[in-house]
Amino acid sequence: MPTIEERVQELADKDEIRELTARYCLAVAEGDADELVALFCPDGTFVTGDRQYSGLAGLRELYGGLAAGVPPKPFIQNHVIEVDGDTATGRCGAEIRMVRKGEAYTVAGHYADVYRRLDGRWRFLSRNFMTYHAVPLSQGWA
């Protein structure tokens, strides 16, 4: 049975990780590539479909163009986190509103994450976005 101190630490870790994912969504919505890259470990990766972006240079390539157009607006929910010392895994659902070639889109999927505590702060070691659907808003998802 975990001690009260261990239980409090687990709750604090989970809260910090939830805040990490919230900061990620805010930075995406604001097109803030510097903040997004800072949320990852130096050897961090982001995977979506068949594309993978690795390391700080790869992440900057991924996020660098967000401010050029209308940045996506991600919303996350149902966040489940398992903490194991200085690493953790998590999964959260995501709904994203975005514009592609001048047309509004709705995207749904989930993030499968691995987190690492680095210099006393939780960061993404990896984010893998799995898409359920990505369709023009005018068509709906069903």
Predicted segment positions?
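Extended, polar beta-sheet/loop recognition surfaces of beta-rich domains
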Residues: G140-A142
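Short, surface-exposed coil-to-beta transition loops
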Residues: P74-I76, T106-Y111
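Short, low-complexity N-terminal intrinsically disordered segments enriched in polar/charged residues
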Residues: M1-E30, D34, A38-L39
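Short beta-strand edge/turn micro-motifs at domain boundaries
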Residues: T89, A108-S138
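Alpha-helical elements of Rossmann-like donor-binding domains used by nucleotide-donor carbohydrate transfer enzymes
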Residues: R23, G58-E61, H110
